[in-house]
């Protein structure tokens, strides 16, 4: 009986360790994304006369524009 309890406890501890590691990794990735540009020296002077460069984006980045395939005007192989 005590052997089964120790197996259950070991399983629960390993599950807890795995979940805490996953949370730590996701938080680290989130912090890396949000602080990527704040430590940059280009972003340090907010009162510059020049407009902000692409290195210091404001807000969320735009999603990439969808690429549309160019259709051919050829009639070859299209039937009668």
Curated annotation (Swiss-Prot):
Residues 1-28 form the signal peptide. One of its GO terms (biological process) is response to salicylic acid. Mostly expressed in leaves, and, to a lower extent, in seedlings shoots, roots, stems, siliques, seeds and flowers. A motif (SxS motif essential for MIK2 binding) lies at residues 38-40, 72-74. The gene is PROSCOOP15. Residues 37-80 are annotated as: Disordered. Disulfide bonds: none annotated. Interacts with MIK2 (via extracellular leucine-rich repeat domain); this interaction triggers the formation of complex between MIK2 and the BAK1/SERK3 and SERK4 coreceptors, and subsequent BAK1 activation by phosphorylation. It is found in: Cell membrane; Secreted, Extracellular space, Apoplast; Endoplasmic reticulum; Golgi apparatus. This is Serine rich endogenous peptide 15. Belongs to the serine rich endogenous peptide (SCOOP) phytocytokine family. One of its GO terms (cellular component) is apoplast. GO terms for molecular function: LRR domain binding; receptor serine/threonine kinase binding. Keywords: Apoplast, Cell membrane, Cleavage on pair of basic residues, Endoplasmic reticulum, Golgi apparatus, Membrane, Repeat, Secreted, Signal. Coiled coil: none annotated. Residues 71-80 have a biased composition (Polar residues). Induction: Induced by salt stress and salicylic acid (SA), but repressed by jasmonate (MeJA), mainly in shoots. Brassicaceae-specific phytocytokine (plant endogenous peptide released into the apoplast) perceived by MIK2 in a BAK1/SERK3 and SERK4 coreceptors-dependent manner, that modulates various physiological and antimicrobial processes including growth prevention and reactive oxygen species (ROS) response regulation. Inhibits root growth. A motif (SCOOP motif 1) lies at residues 32-46. It comes from the Eukaryota. A motif (SCOOP motif 2) lies at residues 66-80.
């Amino acid at each position: 009986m005590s052997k089964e309890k120790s197996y259950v406890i070991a399983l629960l501890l390993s599950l807890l360790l795995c979940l805490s590691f996953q949370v730590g990794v996701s938080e680290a990735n989130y912090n890396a994304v949000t602080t990527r540009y704040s430590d940059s020296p280009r972003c340090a002077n907010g009162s510059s006369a020049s407009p902000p460069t692409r290195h210091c984006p404001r807000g969320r980045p735009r999603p990439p524009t969808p690429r549309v395939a160019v259709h051919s005007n050829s009639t070859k192989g299209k039937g009668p």
